[in-house]
Amino acid sequence: MSSRRNDYHYDGNDHQYRSPLKSNVDQNSFYESSYRSRQSYHQRTKTPRSSYDSPSSSTNSKEHNSPYHYRVPSNNSTRASFGAASTDTNVELPKINLPDSSLSSKLQSCKSACENSSQSLLNVEQQYAQQVHFWEKIRTDIYREGLRSDAAVKSLNDFVNNVSF
């Protein structure tokens, strides 16, 4: 509103709006047009009469004031795209690829391979856990037996050395 209001200059003595474009107009017609413009260009109205708008600004007001860009297609491309199948027989429509029957068998084989590999992984983990548990349990027994066998060999050697025939 303020940008359009700057185009009109207010003279306090005449109580009229003076347009800088109408400087060479005779006074009677100027006052009559100004009187009409003052009635239509009130403070409460958001925009002045459309006669003051230039044709370019009134047609482009949507484009300038809107955050979106409006583009009108230059040719009838929208009509051609929607009515192509009915009007033109030479136009090839895009082919729809239906799901292949082998895809389901491939999916099943992949699922079974995944289940088999996960099952074999579980088996390996269980075997490892059993071996670790067994080794932890047996290790102390083996260590004790090693000590006993070393002691037995030593005592046997001592006995052989001490006995005389």
Curated annotation (Swiss-Prot):
Basic and acidic residues bias spans: 1-17
Described purpose of this protein according to its UniProt entry: Component of the histone H2B ubiquitin ligase complex (HULC) which plays a role in transcription regulation by catalyzing the monoubiquitination of histone H2B to form H2BK123ub1. H2BK123ub1 gives a specific tag for epigenetic transcriptional activation and is also a prerequisite for H3K4me and H3K79me formation.
An annotated GO BP: epigenetic regulation of gene expression
Protein name per its UniProtKB record: Small histone ubiquitination factor 1
Coiled coil: none
Pfam families reported in the protein's UniProt record: Lge1
Keywords carried by this UniProt record: Chromatin regulator, Cytoplasm, Cytoskeleton, Nucleus, Ubl conjugation pathway
Subcellular location: Nucleus; Cytoplasm; Cytoplasm, Cytoskeleton, Microtubule organizing center, Spindle pole body
Compositionally biased tracts (Low complexity): 29-38, 50-60
Transmembrane segment boundaries: none
Subunit: Component of the histone H2B ubiquitin ligase complex (HULC) composed of at least brl1, brl2, rhp6 and shf1.
Major location (coarse): nucleus
InterPro entries linked: Tscrpt_reg_Lge1
Signal peptide from the UniProt entry: none
Keyword Plastid: no
Skewed-composition ranges (Polar residues): 73-86
Domain of life the protein comes from: Eukaryota
Keyword Ion transport: no
Region ranges (Disordered): 1-86
GO cellular component, one term: spindle pole body
